[in-house]
Protein backbone atom coordinates (compact mmCIF):
# COMPACT_ATOMS: atom_id res chain seq x y z
CA UNK A 1 0.00 0.00 0.00
CA UNK A 2 0.98 3.60 -0.58
CA UNK A 3 1.40 6.19 2.17
CA UNK A 4 -1.98 7.61 1.23
CA UNK A 5 -3.56 4.24 1.80
CA UNK A 6 -1.89 4.02 5.25
CA UNK A 7 -3.41 7.34 6.26
CA UNK A 8 -6.90 6.02 5.50
CA UNK A 9 -9.14 4.70 8.19
CA UNK A 10 -9.72 0.95 8.24
CA UNK A 11 -13.18 1.51 6.83
CA UNK A 12 -11.84 3.62 3.98
CA UNK A 13 -9.19 1.02 3.19
CA UNK A 14 -11.78 -1.71 3.01
CA UNK A 15 -14.00 0.48 0.93
CA UNK A 16 -11.09 1.19 -1.46
CA UNK A 17 -10.33 -2.50 -1.80
CA UNK A 18 -14.01 -3.17 -2.42
CA UNK A 19 -14.14 -0.54 -5.14
CA UNK A 20 -11.01 -1.97 -6.80
CA UNK A 21 -12.55 -5.43 -6.81
CA UNK A 22 -15.75 -4.04 -8.25
CA UNK A 23 -13.78 -2.21 -10.95
CA UNK A 24 -11.89 -5.40 -11.86
CA UNK A 25 -15.13 -7.41 -11.95
CA UNK A 26 -16.77 -4.76 -14.11
CA UNK A 27 -13.77 -4.75 -16.40
CA UNK A 28 -13.85 -8.55 -16.74
CA UNK A 29 -17.59 -8.52 -17.36
CA UNK A 30 -17.16 -5.82 -20.02
CA UNK A 31 -14.42 -7.88 -21.67
CA UNK A 32 -16.69 -10.92 -21.74
CA UNK A 33 -19.54 -8.98 -23.36
CA UNK A 34 -17.31 -7.00 -25.74
CA UNK A 35 -14.40 -8.99 -27.21
CA UNK A 36 -12.73 -5.82 -28.41
CA UNK A 37 -11.39 -3.35 -25.90
CA UNK A 38 -12.81 0.10 -25.73
CA UNK A 39 -9.72 1.70 -27.20
CA UNK A 40 -10.09 -0.62 -30.23
CA UNK A 41 -13.32 1.08 -31.27
CA UNK A 42 -11.30 3.02 -33.88
CA UNK A 43 -10.46 1.16 -37.15
CA UNK A 44 -7.06 2.79 -36.94
CA UNK A 45 -6.05 0.84 -33.86
CA UNK A 46 -6.88 -2.45 -35.58
CA UNK A 47 -4.43 -1.70 -38.39
CA UNK A 48 -1.52 -0.82 -36.09
CA UNK A 49 1.49 -3.17 -36.00
CA UNK A 50 1.52 -5.74 -33.28
CA UNK A 51 4.32 -4.05 -31.31
CA UNK A 52 2.47 -0.75 -31.37
CA UNK A 53 -0.73 -2.44 -30.16
CA UNK A 54 1.09 -4.08 -27.25
CA UNK A 55 2.65 -0.77 -26.34
CA UNK A 56 -0.74 0.92 -26.45
CA UNK A 57 -2.29 -1.85 -24.35
CA UNK A 58 0.42 -1.51 -21.70
CA UNK A 59 0.15 2.26 -21.71
CA UNK A 60 -3.63 2.15 -21.55
CA UNK A 61 -3.55 -0.30 -18.64
CA UNK A 62 -1.10 1.89 -16.72
CA UNK A 63 -3.11 5.00 -17.44
CA UNK A 64 -6.29 3.18 -16.52
CA UNK A 65 -4.79 2.12 -13.18
CA UNK A 66 -3.61 5.66 -12.45
CA UNK A 67 -6.96 7.10 -13.43
CA UNK A 68 -8.65 4.47 -11.30
CA UNK A 69 -6.56 5.35 -8.26
CA UNK A 70 -6.97 9.07 -8.84
CA UNK A 71 -10.67 8.54 -9.23
CA UNK A 72 -10.88 6.63 -6.02
CA UNK A 73 -8.80 9.19 -4.15
CA UNK A 74 -10.84 12.07 -5.51
CA UNK A 75 -14.06 10.35 -4.69
CA UNK A 76 -12.83 9.54 -1.19
CA UNK A 77 -11.87 13.14 -0.60
CA UNK A 78 -15.15 14.51 -1.96
CA UNK A 79 -17.54 11.82 -0.86
CA UNK A 80 -17.38 8.26 0.29
CA UNK A 81 -20.83 7.37 -0.98
CA UNK A 82 -20.03 7.46 -4.81
CA UNK A 83 -21.12 4.50 -6.92
CA UNK A 84 -18.66 2.38 -8.96
CA UNK A 85 -20.62 2.56 -12.27
CA UNK A 86 -20.21 6.33 -12.40
CA UNK A 87 -16.45 5.98 -11.98
CA UNK A 88 -16.34 3.33 -14.72
CA UNK A 89 -18.16 5.60 -17.18
CA UNK A 90 -15.66 8.39 -16.60
CA UNK A 91 -12.74 6.02 -17.10
CA UNK A 92 -14.24 4.66 -20.32
CA UNK A 93 -14.79 8.20 -21.66
CA UNK A 94 -11.18 9.10 -20.93
CA UNK A 95 -9.95 5.92 -22.63
CA UNK A 96 -11.99 6.68 -25.75
CA UNK A 97 -10.54 10.19 -25.86
CA UNK A 98 -7.02 8.74 -25.69
CA UNK A 99 -7.88 6.33 -28.53
CA UNK A 100 -9.09 9.19 -30.75
CA UNK A 101 -5.94 11.19 -30.03
CA UNK A 102 -3.76 8.21 -30.97
CA UNK A 103 -5.71 7.73 -34.21
CA UNK A 104 -5.31 11.41 -35.17
CA UNK A 105 -1.56 11.25 -34.52
CA UNK A 106 -1.24 8.10 -36.68
CA UNK A 107 -3.13 9.69 -39.58
CA UNK A 108 -0.85 12.73 -39.48
CA UNK A 109 2.17 10.44 -39.52
CA UNK A 110 0.81 8.53 -42.53
CA UNK A 111 0.24 11.79 -44.43
CA UNK A 112 3.80 12.93 -43.77
CA UNK A 113 5.27 9.50 -44.68
CA UNK A 114 6.30 9.39 -48.38
CA UNK A 115 4.55 6.86 -50.66
CA UNK A 116 6.49 3.85 -51.91
CA UNK A 117 5.47 4.59 -55.50
CA UNK A 118 6.46 8.24 -55.29
CA UNK A 119 9.91 7.26 -54.07
CA UNK A 120 10.13 4.64 -56.83
CA UNK A 121 9.46 7.14 -59.68
CA UNK A 122 11.27 10.03 -58.05
CA UNK A 123 13.65 11.62 -60.54
CA UNK A 124 12.30 9.69 -63.57
CA UNK A 125 10.45 12.65 -65.16
CA UNK A 126 13.39 13.83 -67.34
CA UNK A 127 13.93 10.29 -68.60
CA UNK A 128 10.26 9.89 -69.52
CA UNK A 129 10.32 13.19 -71.42
CA UNK A 130 13.19 11.93 -73.56
CA UNK A 131 11.67 8.51 -74.16
CA UNK A 132 8.02 9.38 -74.85
CA UNK A 133 8.40 9.78 -78.69
CA UNK A 134 9.92 6.31 -78.96
CA UNK A 135 7.29 4.89 -76.63
CA UNK A 136 4.52 6.50 -78.70
CA UNK A 137 5.91 4.96 -81.91
CA UNK A 138 6.12 1.54 -80.27
CA UNK A 139 2.54 1.80 -79.05
CA UNK A 140 1.29 2.88 -82.49
CA UNK A 141 3.13 0.03 -84.22
CA UNK A 142 1.73 -2.43 -81.71
CA UNK A 143 -1.84 -1.18 -82.12
CA UNK A 144 -1.47 -1.13 -85.92
CA UNK A 145 -0.20 -4.71 -85.93
CA UNK A 146 -3.15 -5.83 -83.85
CA UNK A 147 -5.53 -4.07 -86.25
CA UNK A 148 -3.97 -5.69 -89.34
CA UNK A 149 -4.41 -9.21 -87.99
CA UNK A 150 -7.90 -8.55 -86.65
CA UNK A 151 -11.15 -9.11 -88.63
CA UNK A 152 -11.74 -5.34 -88.59
CA UNK A 153 -9.06 -4.88 -91.26
CA UNK A 154 -11.08 -7.02 -93.71
CA UNK A 155 -14.20 -5.84 -95.52
CA UNK A 156 -17.40 -7.17 -93.95
CA UNK A 157 -20.14 -5.90 -96.30
CA UNK A 158 -20.33 -4.30 -99.76
CA UNK A 159 -23.62 -2.64 -100.71
CA UNK A 160 -24.86 -0.86 -103.84
CA UNK A 161 -27.29 2.07 -103.94
CA UNK A 162 -28.77 4.29 -106.66
CA UNK A 163 -29.09 1.48 -109.19
CA UNK A 164 -32.45 1.17 -110.96
CA UNK A 165 -31.66 -0.93 -114.04
CA UNK A 166 -28.55 -2.86 -113.04
CA UNK A 167 -28.80 -5.33 -110.13
CA UNK A 168 -26.67 -4.95 -107.01
CA UNK A 169 -25.32 -8.48 -107.46
CA UNK A 170 -24.06 -7.67 -110.96
CA UNK A 171 -22.39 -4.45 -109.81
CA UNK A 172 -20.74 -6.21 -106.86
CA UNK A 173 -19.51 -9.00 -109.13
CA UNK A 174 -18.08 -6.50 -111.65
CA UNK A 175 -16.22 -4.67 -108.88
CA UNK A 176 -14.21 -7.78 -107.99
CA UNK A 177 -14.49 -6.97 -104.27
CA UNK A 178 -14.70 -9.92 -101.86
CA UNK A 179 -15.41 -10.00 -98.14
CA UNK A 180 -11.89 -11.28 -97.39
CA UNK A 181 -10.18 -8.33 -99.11
CA UNK A 182 -8.11 -5.87 -97.09
CA UNK A 183 -9.63 -2.46 -96.48
CA UNK A 184 -6.36 -0.76 -97.42
CA UNK A 185 -6.21 -2.68 -100.71
CA UNK A 186 -9.68 -1.45 -101.66
CA UNK A 187 -8.89 2.14 -100.69
CA UNK A 188 -5.69 2.09 -102.76
CA UNK A 189 -7.52 0.74 -105.85
CA UNK A 190 -10.72 2.72 -105.36
CA UNK A 191 -10.55 4.71 -108.62
CA UNK A 192 -9.65 1.64 -110.65
CA UNK A 193 -12.63 -0.29 -109.27
CA UNK A 194 -14.97 2.62 -110.05
CA UNK A 195 -13.71 2.80 -113.66
CA UNK A 196 -14.15 -0.96 -114.09
CA UNK A 197 -17.80 -0.79 -113.05
CA UNK A 198 -18.50 2.15 -115.37
CA UNK A 199 -16.96 0.33 -118.34
CA UNK A 200 -18.85 -2.86 -117.58
CA UNK A 201 -22.30 -1.24 -117.56
CA UNK A 202 -23.15 1.33 -120.29
CA UNK A 203 -26.17 2.46 -118.29
CA UNK A 204 -23.97 3.58 -115.38
CA UNK A 205 -22.59 7.09 -115.78
CA UNK A 206 -20.64 7.34 -112.51
CA UNK A 207 -19.72 5.24 -109.48
CA UNK A 208 -18.44 6.45 -106.12
CA UNK A 209 -17.16 3.94 -103.55
CA UNK A 210 -17.47 5.20 -99.98
CA UNK A 211 -15.89 3.72 -96.84
CA UNK A 212 -17.96 3.42 -93.65
CA UNK A 213 -16.29 2.71 -90.29
CA UNK A 214 -15.24 0.16 -89.27
CA UNK A 215 -15.16 -2.12 -92.35
CA UNK A 216 -18.12 -1.45 -94.65
CA UNK A 217 -18.06 -0.18 -98.26
CA UNK A 218 -20.88 1.25 -100.36
CA UNK A 219 -20.96 1.83 -104.13
CA UNK A 220 -23.17 4.82 -104.97
CA UNK A 221 -24.28 4.41 -108.59
CA UNK A 222 -25.54 7.12 -110.93
CA UNK A 223 -27.21 5.82 -114.09
CA UNK A 224 -27.73 7.43 -117.49
CA UNK A 225 -31.29 8.56 -118.15
CA UNK A 226 -33.44 7.45 -121.08
CA UNK A 227 -33.28 10.01 -123.89
CA UNK A 228 -34.99 8.89 -127.15
CA UNK A 229 -35.86 5.81 -129.20
CA UNK A 230 -34.51 4.80 -132.58
CA UNK A 231 -36.51 2.63 -134.98
CA UNK A 232 -34.66 0.29 -137.32
CA UNK A 233 -36.09 -2.57 -139.40
CA UNK A 234 -39.41 -2.38 -137.52
CA UNK A 235 -37.60 -2.77 -134.17
CA UNK A 236 -37.44 -0.02 -131.54
CA UNK A 237 -34.36 0.48 -129.38
CA UNK A 238 -33.78 2.68 -126.34
CA UNK A 239 -31.13 5.41 -126.53
CA UNK A 240 -29.48 6.74 -123.35
CA UNK A 241 -28.64 10.38 -122.72
CA UNK A 242 -25.01 9.72 -123.70
CA UNK A 243 -26.08 8.53 -127.17
CA UNK A 244 -25.56 4.84 -126.43
CA UNK A 245 -28.10 2.55 -128.14
CA UNK A 246 -29.25 -0.40 -126.03
CA UNK A 247 -29.07 -3.42 -128.32
CA UNK A 248 -32.07 -5.17 -126.75
CA UNK A 249 -35.33 -4.24 -128.57
CA UNK A 250 -38.06 -2.56 -126.55
CA UNK A 251 -41.65 -3.76 -126.44
CA UNK A 252 -43.58 -1.32 -128.63
CA UNK A 253 -46.49 -1.35 -126.16
CA UNK A 254 -44.27 -0.13 -123.30
CA UNK A 255 -42.69 2.94 -124.87
CA UNK A 256 -42.27 6.09 -122.83
CA UNK A 257 -43.24 9.52 -124.15
CA UNK A 258 -39.93 10.10 -125.90
CA UNK A 259 -39.10 11.11 -129.51
CA UNK A 260 -38.68 8.26 -132.00
CA UNK A 261 -35.90 8.62 -134.57
CA UNK A 262 -36.63 6.90 -137.88
CA UNK A 263 -33.73 4.97 -139.45
CA UNK A 264 -30.93 7.04 -137.88
CA UNK A 265 -27.49 5.45 -137.82
CA UNK A 266 -25.37 5.45 -134.64
CA UNK A 267 -23.48 8.62 -135.55
CA UNK A 268 -26.67 10.51 -136.39
CA UNK A 269 -28.28 9.25 -133.18
CA UNK A 270 -25.40 10.55 -131.07
CA UNK A 271 -25.45 13.94 -132.83
CA UNK A 272 -29.20 14.28 -132.26
CA UNK A 273 -29.03 13.23 -128.58
CA UNK A 274 -26.17 15.62 -127.81
CA UNK A 275 -28.25 18.52 -129.18
CA UNK A 276 -31.51 17.23 -127.70
CA UNK A 277 -30.14 17.07 -124.14
CA UNK A 278 -29.27 20.80 -124.26
CA UNK A 279 -32.90 21.82 -124.89
CA UNK A 280 -35.35 22.90 -122.23
CA UNK A 281 -37.77 20.23 -120.95
CA UNK A 282 -40.75 22.22 -122.33
CA UNK A 283 -39.42 21.87 -125.89
CA UNK A 284 -38.29 18.26 -125.46
CA UNK A 285 -41.72 17.21 -124.26
CA UNK A 286 -43.32 18.48 -127.53
CA UNK A 287 -41.18 16.33 -129.85
CA UNK A 288 -42.76 13.05 -130.99
CA UNK A 289 -41.34 11.76 -134.28
CA UNK A 290 -38.16 12.65 -136.19
CA UNK A 291 -37.46 11.74 -139.83
CA UNK A 292 -34.64 12.53 -142.22
CA UNK A 293 -35.63 14.87 -145.09
CA UNK A 294 -32.41 15.79 -146.88
CA UNK A 295 -32.42 18.47 -149.57
CA UNK A 296 -29.95 19.40 -152.27
CA UNK A 297 -28.75 22.28 -150.12
CA UNK A 298 -28.93 20.53 -146.70
CA UNK A 299 -28.03 16.87 -146.54
CA UNK A 300 -28.76 16.55 -142.78
CA UNK A 301 -32.19 18.21 -142.96
CA UNK A 302 -34.72 16.61 -140.56
CA UNK A 303 -38.43 17.00 -139.89
CA UNK A 304 -39.61 17.01 -136.24
CA UNK A 305 -43.30 16.40 -135.56
CA UNK A 306 -44.54 18.32 -132.53
CA UNK A 307 -47.40 17.30 -130.26
CA UNK A 308 -49.11 20.69 -130.82
CA UNK A 309 -49.66 19.80 -134.50
CA UNK A 310 -46.80 21.79 -135.99
CA UNK A 311 -43.74 20.46 -137.75
CA UNK A 312 -40.24 21.89 -137.47
CA UNK A 313 -37.72 21.45 -140.26
CA UNK A 314 -34.14 22.13 -139.35
CA UNK A 315 -30.69 20.80 -140.09
CA UNK A 316 -29.38 18.27 -137.59
CA UNK A 317 -26.18 20.25 -137.11
CA UNK A 318 -28.16 23.41 -136.17
CA UNK A 319 -30.75 21.74 -133.94
CA UNK A 320 -29.34 23.05 -130.65
CA UNK A 321 -29.07 26.63 -132.00
CA UNK A 322 -32.36 26.99 -133.92
CA UNK A 323 -34.93 24.96 -131.98
CA UNK A 324 -34.92 27.17 -128.82
CA UNK A 325 -36.73 29.84 -130.94
CA UNK A 326 -39.66 27.53 -131.61
CA UNK A 327 -41.88 28.43 -128.57
CA UNK A 328 -41.95 32.13 -129.51
CA UNK A 329 -42.75 31.26 -133.16
CA UNK A 330 -45.48 28.78 -132.18
CA UNK A 331 -47.32 31.48 -130.23
CA UNK A 332 -47.68 33.59 -133.38
CA UNK A 333 -49.11 30.91 -135.69
CA UNK A 334 -52.13 28.67 -135.74
CA UNK A 335 -51.44 24.96 -136.09
CA UNK A 336 -50.86 23.02 -138.16
CA UNK A 337 -47.91 24.95 -139.51
CA UNK A 338 -44.50 24.05 -140.84
CA UNK A 339 -41.70 26.06 -139.26
CA UNK A 340 -38.83 26.01 -141.71
CA UNK A 341 -35.45 26.84 -140.15
CA UNK A 342 -33.21 25.90 -143.06
CA UNK A 343 -32.43 29.45 -144.18
CA UNK A 344 -33.69 31.80 -141.54
CA UNK A 345 -37.09 31.05 -139.96
CA UNK A 346 -40.42 31.20 -141.79
CA UNK A 347 -43.76 29.43 -141.43
CA UNK A 348 -46.24 28.02 -143.94
CA UNK A 349 -49.46 26.08 -143.45
CA UNK A 350 -48.75 22.41 -143.49
CA UNK A 351 -51.06 21.67 -146.44
CA UNK A 352 -49.46 24.38 -148.55
CA UNK A 353 -46.02 23.21 -147.56
CA UNK A 354 -46.87 19.62 -148.48
CA UNK A 355 -48.21 20.83 -151.85
CA UNK A 356 -45.03 22.80 -152.35
CA UNK A 357 -42.96 19.72 -151.54
CA UNK A 358 -45.08 17.63 -153.91
CA UNK A 359 -44.66 20.17 -156.69
CA UNK A 360 -40.96 20.34 -155.95
CA UNK A 361 -40.72 16.59 -156.05
CA UNK A 362 -42.63 16.46 -159.36
CA UNK A 363 -40.41 19.10 -160.88
CA UNK A 364 -37.39 17.26 -159.65
CA UNK A 365 -38.66 14.02 -161.11
CA UNK A 366 -39.41 15.71 -164.44
CA UNK A 367 -35.97 17.23 -164.47
CA UNK A 368 -34.43 13.88 -163.78
CA UNK A 369 -36.54 12.29 -166.52
CA UNK A 370 -35.52 14.98 -168.99
CA UNK A 371 -31.91 14.48 -168.11
CA UNK A 372 -32.26 10.76 -168.56
CA UNK A 373 -34.00 11.30 -171.95
CA UNK A 374 -31.20 13.54 -173.11
CA UNK A 375 -28.70 10.93 -172.07
CA UNK A 376 -30.68 8.31 -174.01
CA UNK A 377 -30.90 10.49 -177.15
CA UNK A 378 -27.21 11.28 -176.96
CA UNK A 379 -26.43 7.63 -176.61
CA UNK A 380 -28.64 6.80 -179.63
CA UNK A 381 -26.96 9.45 -181.79
CA UNK A 382 -23.56 8.16 -180.84
CA UNK A 383 -24.63 4.65 -181.77
CA UNK A 384 -25.98 5.77 -185.18
CA UNK A 385 -22.83 7.71 -186.00
CA UNK A 386 -20.63 4.78 -185.14
CA UNK A 387 -22.78 2.51 -187.39
CA UNK A 388 -22.54 4.91 -190.38
CA UNK A 389 -18.80 5.21 -189.99
CA UNK A 390 -18.31 1.47 -190.00
CA UNK A 391 -20.45 1.00 -193.21
CA UNK A 392 -18.36 3.57 -195.07
From Swiss-Prot:
Residues 1-88, 368-392 are annotated as: Disordered. The keyword Cell cycle applies. Residues 14-32 have a biased composition (Basic and acidic residues). Residues 153-392 are extracellular. It comes from the Bacteria. Coiled coil: none annotated. It is a single-pass type II membrane protein. Pfam families: FtsQ_DivIB_C, POTRA_1. This is Cell division protein DivIB. The lineage of its organism: Bacteria, Bacillati, Bacillota, Bacilli, Lactobacillales.
Amino acid sequence: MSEKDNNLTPWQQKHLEYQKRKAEEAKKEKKANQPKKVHFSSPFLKSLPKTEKNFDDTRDEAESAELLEEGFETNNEETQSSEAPIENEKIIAQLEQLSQENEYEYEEEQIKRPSRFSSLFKGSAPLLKKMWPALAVVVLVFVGSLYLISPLSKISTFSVSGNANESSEQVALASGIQTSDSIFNILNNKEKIEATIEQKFPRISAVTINYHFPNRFEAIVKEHTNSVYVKRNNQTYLVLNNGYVITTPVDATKLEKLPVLQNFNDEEVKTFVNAYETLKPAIKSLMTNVTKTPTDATKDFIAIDMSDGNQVRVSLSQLADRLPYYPSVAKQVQAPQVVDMEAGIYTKPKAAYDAYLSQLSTSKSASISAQNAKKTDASSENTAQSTTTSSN
